């Protein structure tokens, strides 16, 4: 597949997602980085977003809850270039009924080459990166070219 460049803006659009057993960990992480996150636009699946907003006072654009379609809403935003970073604390020790949605969300984040953190260490690496609040060019699929090839 041919690639093109997308520039992630200095003010990132960050999606926050956490499975039930990981929500408190995400809350503590957001609280720890609240001052920096306040400079960015936050999105989240429903329950997570409402909990983060209530706990921190940060403005969070909440989608539906993950099992009700929120993971897919976030995935669609990634595919549309409307999410720049995904912080997704998922629970590897407990199965969730919407596991196919989880896999699809992670697949889309990989396809569209956005930074993804699935644990505390990676989330800290991303947010503490010197480039976190700068613009950043990333390679993404050249969808118009992909579509043109498929329609030949």
Curated annotation (Swiss-Prot):
Known EC number: 4.2.3.3
GO cellular component: cytosol
Record domain MGS-like: where: 6-152
GO molecular function: methylglyoxal synthase activity
Residues reported in the UniProt entry to bind substrate: 19, 23, 45-48, 65-66, 98
Active site positions, chain numbering: 71 (proton donor/acceptor)
Catalytic reaction annotation: dihydroxyacetone phosphate = methylglyoxal + phosphate
Function noted in UniProt: Catalyzes the formation of methylglyoxal from dihydroxyacetone phosphate.
NCBIfam families: MGSA, PRK05234.1
Similarity comment text for this entry: Belongs to the methylglyoxal synthase family.
Entry superkingdom: Bacteria
Pfam family, one: MGS
Keywords for the protein's UniProt record, in alphabetical order: Lyase
Protein name: Methylglyoxal synthase
SUPFAM superfamilies: Methylglyoxal synthase-like (SSF52335)
GO BP terms: methylglyoxal biosynthetic process
């Amino acid at each position: 597949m041919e690639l093109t460049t997308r520039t992630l803006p200095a003010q990132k659009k960050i999606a926050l997602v956490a499975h039930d057993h990981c929500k408190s960990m995400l809350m503590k992480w957001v609280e720890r980085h609240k001052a920096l996150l306040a400079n960015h636009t936050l999105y989240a699946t429903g329950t997570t977003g409402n909990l983060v907003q209530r706990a921190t006072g940060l403005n969070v654009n909440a989608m539906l809850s993950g099992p009700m379609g929120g993971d897919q809403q976030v995935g669609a935003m990634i595919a549309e270039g409307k999410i720049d970073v995904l912080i997704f604390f998922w629970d590897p020790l407990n199965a969730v009924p919407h596991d196919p949605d989880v896999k699809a969300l992670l697949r889309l984040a990989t396809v569209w080459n956005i930074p993804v953190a699935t644990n505390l260490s990676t989330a800290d690496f991303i947010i503490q990166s010197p480039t976190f609040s700068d613009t950043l060019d990333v390679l993404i699929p050249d969808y118009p070219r992909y579509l043109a090839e498929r329609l030949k």
